[in-house]
Amino acid sequence: GYVNGWNAAEETLEANREAGEFDSSAGAIRNVTHNGCGHILHDLFWQNMSPEGGDEPAGALADRIAEDFGSYDAWKGEFEAAAGAAGGWALLVYDSFSNQLRNVVVDKHDQGALWGSHPILALDVWEHSYYHDYGPARGDFISA
């Protein structure tokens, strides 16, 4: 899994540093990035999932969505469009560079992220997430 891959890559990097040999470091760094991002995004996705979930946000998050997107419905429409176009993930992130919430597409775990952004919500739209229950109807999964 992602954690094992991440840990193995970290061990390789540590051994390379100690030995002063860096031939395998580039691959290990890619594995840290891929497995680390895969683990973090899946962890956030599972935290977002709840049998009681699905309601509109309240409080500061709701206020910020209204400020940055105009309304919850506008945010939701844009988020669903991002998820429909994504090869891997749609994320609601806080972009600290522009000080606003954004919907972003991340086609692979480690590609498409916006530097300085902090993920708030993640939707896994890889086929393994929906195909068993929804078949090819990815849009139905996104709307659920």
From Swiss-Prot:
GO molecular-function terms, A-Z: metal ion binding; superoxide dismutase activity
Cofactor binding description: Binds 1 Mn(2+) ion per subunit.
Gene3D superfamilies: Fe,Mn superoxide dismutase (SOD) domain, Iron/manganese superoxide dismutase, C-terminal domain
Top EC class for this record: oxidoreductase
UniProt catalytic activity: 2 superoxide + 2 H(+) = H2O2 + O2
Annotated binding of Mn(2+), by residue: H42, D124, H128
Keywords: Manganese, Metal-binding, Oxidoreductase
Cofactors demanded by this protein: Mn(2+)
EC number from the UniProt entry: 1.15.1.1
PANTHER family linked: SUPEROXIDE DISMUTASE 2, SUPEROXIDE DISMUTASE [MN], MITOCHONDRIAL
Function: Destroys superoxide anion radicals which are normally produced within the cells and which are toxic to biological systems.
Stated family: Belongs to the iron/manganese superoxide dismutase family.
Protein name as it appears in the record: Superoxide dismutase [Mn] 1
Organism classification: Archaea, Methanobacteriati, Methanobacteriota, Stenosarchaea group, Halobacteria
